[in-house]
Amino acid sequence: QATNVASALGADWLNDLGYFRTASGEIADVPVTASRVSYVGEAGWEISCQSRDAVRLYQALFRQGARPVGSLAVSAMRVEKGFMSYGHDIDTDTVPAEAGLDFTLDWSSDFIGKSALQMAAGSKPTKRIVSLVFDDEMVTPLGNEPVVGKGGLIGKTTSAAFGYRLGKPVALALIDAEYARDDEMVDIDLAGCHVAARVVTGPAFDPTGRRMRKAASA
């Protein structure tokens, strides 16, 4: 649908934009900058323009079929995709390896905290952020629920939502690394009731990222 909207507005250059690329152009005669990135795990763009042009751009997109969505929908989709939110899933105390973000470190450059990370580089993280999938469609995790393993408390959920693409509730959780294995079963304490969840070490939805990386015109 997004590609059809772009084409209808004479902005086919958006459809030619490669994944993780940024370009400037026009949509409905409005100068914009578009980035081919995704916070929800689908092919699309993040588009910015001058504030004075925002209403005109919005109206042009709306006339061609684009529809606004709420923040809860966006949050649910990013939890399905395993995208972490700063302040919810990660913060200044998070070690990059715990979040699977150590690949972003440039050891050839200097940065704040480098010496501390170098000292810890030889040891495996004691905690990991994972996805949790619930088979019970009726449970309603909200985040910050205790996660329980065979040995007792092993962590907590950090974000949660109903995953409409999966058809199941999903959550992100920071848990003891020994439980961070695909298909490991853990319990979530929901208001005193233990509910089973399955561990997924990557994104619960589209783990390869094919949907958001595919050619926008495909």
Segments (PLM) and residue ranges:
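Conserved, structured C-terminal
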Residues: 1-218
